[in-house]
Amino acid sequence: MRTTHIEDRDNNSLENKHTDHIEGVENGKGTQEPPSPSGFGGHLIDENLVHVEGEDKVTWYLCFLISASAIAGFLFGYDTGVVGVALPLVGTDLGGNELNSSQQEIITAGTTIGAIFGSAILGGWGDHLGRKMAILISDVFFTVGAVIIASSYSVPQIIVGRIVLGVGVGGAAVIAPLFITETAPTAVRGRCIGVNAFFIPFGQLVADSIGAGVQNMHGGWRLLFALGAVPSLIQLLLFHYLPESPRILIVKGDIDRARNVFQRIYPTATHEMVDYKLRVAQEYVAATTALQSGTTFWERVKKVWKTGSYRRSIIAVSVLQAAGQLCGFNTLLYYAGTLFGLLGLSNPALGGLIPAGTNAVFVLIGMSTVDKIGRRGLLLVGVPVLLLGLVWNIIGFYYMCKPTGGFLDTSYSYDTTNVGIVIGGIVFYVAGFGLTYSHLVWYQAEYLALEVRSMGSGVATTVCWIANLVVSVSYLSELETMTPSGTYGFYLGLSVIAFVFVVFCFPETKQLSIDETSLLFENDWGVKRSVQMRKERHETRKRFKDVELAEAATAHFEARQQKSASVSPAELSKFMAGLKGGKRKPQVLV
């Protein structure tokens, strides 16, 4: 059998140019002067041209790897969503008195405070610990925090438990999407990261569903918090069978284990093509890890800030994280029970299913289209929907609350039509959030070079939690001072500013490999360069494909001629049309 692969020829031609450098990496020694990404004719080896059999398919092993990793997303969602339905059930169980609004805000903010430390510490040390160990440490904090909260009999104890839990939430929020980004094949990377992103609203939906079912159960809030320990224990068990990120293994010089991981991710690929994939990863690792050689942590931080490409990429993902919080969506999660109770629903916890369910549905839609429409494409389509939803809420709350002076009054029975209009606005608003920020903020690792990927993810996620803290501790107070319309008007203003940033400063990563995306910010914010790189990639692959088809046709007709079979021009045209239409494969039996 003769199979024509332009990718094979392209990389064979590259092999001799890079032998010395690659051998240095394989020996775990690296090189004294790693080449810059532009040192190889302007580019390193293009991963998109190293095509592996079955690369665009999700295998059972990849499903297991992604699902086990995404449990961290479920824990993130469950433990941030559960507080909104659990706190109204506490009653007088914590000190004999009902929780006031200040205590609710502090308890809610406890997880956010812990998450700030968790994302900063585990994100900053993610390269040294490894992705796998960082996730396992997060699971320990998840489990211990859940036990402390479920056994609480005082407000200080539950706050401590929420802070401990928050460390796990923050660490998982950084490391899980980072781990998935570094292990998933380029062709399906968007969907794989999307699974973790979907598990976040799915966890919130599960928390709301269980909360609705334990409304009349004595101590039901304890059960809600205790159940959070179950997924973390499951992930602790499953991660025993999962590998370390192959790129971290390469950094540590463990090339054999990295090769084994690639072989399991691409089970139908030949050893030769797996080695090509490994070589691509080694080239980028060697070219992008010079920052970590012989410098202290603070020296690296200083260098990161002074290097324009690093600084711009971290700012870009940090702004997107902040935008996902400052649009106000998480107020619907944290205070769902309180808000829908004020709206007059008899079962506030059941009302919390509305934003959680809507979010989950539209995250599914977003993650299923992200590799086609793109990250930036979804933002440009979905954020305007979110903005219109905020305008809808502003108008809806204004007219609904007119009889009570613009403020929400728990003792007043609001007109059901106006309540329905507000709920409709919330659904529309959440739909826009689900299509965009709910999952796209967790693609942050795609935009960061390997040497700053863990640190940058930690910074961006820390920004996320700081913004979350600001919103969560001020929401109830804002409702009481600024009115609901004023509160959502404030969120609208911040969201418009964020959207302007997205339009001018947030590039597309669709069709680019995880190692190529870090090159976008070399000279500017990369919006135009992203378009140019993807256009060049498309044209290059098209040229290679045309050459491949022509060679396949030539081989076919050479075989026919050897059998003394005549070939007409019409038959040649028909054969080429079949190749281009995908009806024939570019391989020939001779």
Swiss-Prot record:
Induction / repression: Induced during sexual reproduction. Expressed during infection.
Biased composition (Basic and acidic residues): 1-26
Pfam families membership: Sugar_tr
Cellular localization per UniProt: Cell membrane
A GO CC term attached to the entry: plasma membrane
Catalysed reaction, written as an equation: myo-inositol(out) + H(+)(out) = myo-inositol(in) + H(+)(in)
Region Disordered, residue ranges: 1-40
Keyword annotations: Cell membrane, Glycoprotein, Membrane, Transmembrane, Transmembrane helix, Transport
Parts of the chain on the Cytoplasmic side: 1-57, 127-132, 179-192, 244-325, 371-376, 442-455, 507-590
Extracellular-side positions: 79-105, 154-157, 214-222, 347-349, 398-420, 477-485
UniProt superkingdom: Eukaryota
Any GO BP: myo-inositol transport
GO molecular function: transmembrane transporter activity
Membrane topology reported for the UniProt record: Multi-pass membrane protein
Family listed: Belongs to the major facilitator superfamily. Sugar transporter (TC 2.A.1.1) family.
Cited function: Transporter for myo-inositol.
Protein name per its UniProtKB record: Myo-inositol transporter 3
Gene that this sequence comes from: ITR3
